[in-house]
Amino acid sequence: FKLTPYFFSYTISKTGLYTLTKTSAMSLSPNIRVNGIAPGPTIKNKRQSEKHFKKQYLATPLKQQVDVNEICNAVDFFIKNSSITGQVLAIDSGQSLNWQTPDIIKGKE
């Protein structure tokens, strides 16, 4: 996940998901498996214009919005594979690889 001081809510939610998933998996095993999904641009939020949302997903390497069915498929994958625990799967069209935050745009990274 891309840690960035420009989007605190994103950074806190993704690192929180990651840490909660890992520590819960350690704490609850072997009886309970814990995995997480870190989605990218899937659904436009209430404060976002359609134009801004489109700009967001077009800035990903795959240049596409995440389909909700892909997230459902990931849940199904985790359910069907009993040897997986403590993993977070980024279904984000590659957003976490090169999210175009100001530090990237200005060439600071």
Report each predicted region and the residues it spans.
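C-terminal substrate-recognition "lid" of short-chain dehydrogenase/reductases
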Residues: 69-91, 96, 102
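A conserved structural motif in NAD(P)-dependent oxidoreductases
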Residues: 60-71
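Catalytic loop of short-chain dehydrogenase/reductase
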Residues: 1-16, 21-29, 41, 95
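Short alpha-helix in the Rossmann-fold core of NAD(P)-dependent oxidoreductases
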Residues: 5, 13, 35, 63-64
